[in-house]
Amino acid sequence: MQVKAPRGTYDILPQDSVKWQYIEKIMRDSAESFGFRAIRTPLFEHTELFQRGVGQGTDIVSKEMYSFNDRSQRSLTLRPEGTAPCARALIEHGIYSGVMPVKWYYLGPMFRYDRPQTGRYRQFHQFGVEAFGSNSPYLDAEIIILLVEILRRLGLDDYELHLNSLGCSVCRDDYRQKLLQHISPFKEQLCQDCQQRYMQNPLRVLDCKMETCHQAIRGYPIFYDHLCPYCQEHYSRVQAALQANGISYIHDNNLVRGLDYYSNTAFEIHLPGIGAQSAVGGGGRYDGLVKELGGPDIPGIGFALGMERLLLALDMLGKSKFSNPSLDVFVVVMNDAYEMQGLQLVNELRRRGIRADKDYGGRSGKAQMKYAGKTAARFVVMVGEEEVEKHFWTLRDMQSKEQWQLGQEELISSIRSVIETK
């Protein structure tokens, strides 16, 4: 039997890792420039965290979670998203008693039992940010500005930002009743999933991708028209702040997001140039989440970006400008008798900040030189009888084909003078 990676998962091989490292660095640098700090939470949590936090009626909880019982019969779940674990960490460690807002970012794998397709996997990776402790609309704007800034630094300027308000608990309850009244006569025309969502959270019907459901509920009341005065003012200030910072957006009445914890500001970012699966990230405000999980009444807002989708977009839009790091030096040992000296030299080069390697396959000197060419190393250092006896090293520039005999310190300074100007 051939052992393969499970369906919906994949390996990130060395030639691809450089792409990941590139976008990860841009994301980290961007978040830290906005005052966010890194947090790492467990890959699995108690199942109840997601049932309470994400919502029992969501597709994630009802269909997509990887849950299992441990040996003590406790139900655990591989994390399907990153916000609820961050809220749990905030509560568990009492971090809300310090300076607010708390601003965190995270990066790592998530897990959902979904139908694998282009840009969508069962183990996937997200970069996300969370800010707890402020309900300022200007913090909402800052979070969105950070999202846009990451895309800009990646060269993805042709984006569409979709924006909506999902109101507070007061105006949402009022709207929920009006939406139920509108949908009720057509509930038999809804898809099976929406018939189940209908009573649990009718807003989820608006998020359905089935055309039959769109047709059945057409003419539904618009949430924006039912916002309370506070939520109207909050949303207006978010819009004004985005406009003042040159961020264009589309007000999208259909945008409700797929998780139950969202309130007030909600947003998604799309890259129209990559086809039907154009959404690469999104987020919003979740002012009731911390309290729902047993903590104090602390507001929060955040977003998550799908890293596989971003990499797909960079490839499709011709924005991939990645090159695998090459060696600076390959050390060629001309005779087995000098393996120890070769190993000492290669490790001294590494300690001095030079990317270096040597052969461990017993190749001849000629074969090692040929192999060094395949590694794309800029320099070769030859270690042989003459070099060891006379205490110098032979340095060869693989581009110019020039060759010198140098003492060790002169060798290192010569190599560094070239690689530091790359």
Swiss-Prot record:
Q: Does the keyword Signal feature in the UniProt annotation?
A: no
Q: Which reaction does it catalyse?
A: tRNA(His) + L-histidine + ATP = L-histidyl-tRNA(His) + AMP + diphosphate + H(+)
Alphabetized InterPro entries for the sequence: aa-tRNA-synth_II, aa-tRNA-synth_II/BPL/LPL, Anticodon-bd, Anticodon-bd_dom_sf, His-tRNA-ligase, HisRS-like_core, HisRS/HisZ
Which CDD domains does the entry mention?
Answer: HisRS-like_core
GO BP? histidyl-tRNA aminoacylation
Main localization category: cytoplasm
Q: Which SUPFAM superfamilies match?
A: Class II aaRS ABD-related, Class II aaRS and biotin synthetases
Compartments it resides in: Cytoplasm
Signal sequence residues? none
Domain of life of the native organism: Bacteria
Q: Give the GO molecular function terms.
A: ATP binding; catalytic activity, acting on a protein; histidine-tRNA ligase activity; transferase activity
What EC number(s) has UniProt assigned to this enzyme? 6.1.1.21
Top enzyme class: ligase
Look up keyword Endoplasmic reticulum and say if it applies. Answer: no
Q: Keywords assigned by UniProt?
A: Aminoacyl-tRNA synthetase, ATP-binding, Cytoplasm, Ligase, Nucleotide-binding, Protein biosynthesis
* One Gene Ontology term, aspect cellular component: cytoplasm
Report quaternary structure and partners.
Homodimer.
Entry-linked NCBIfam families: hisS
- Family stated for the protein in its record: Belongs to the class-II aminoacyl-tRNA synthetase family.
> What protein am I looking at?
Histidine--tRNA ligase
Gene name of the encoded protein:
hisS
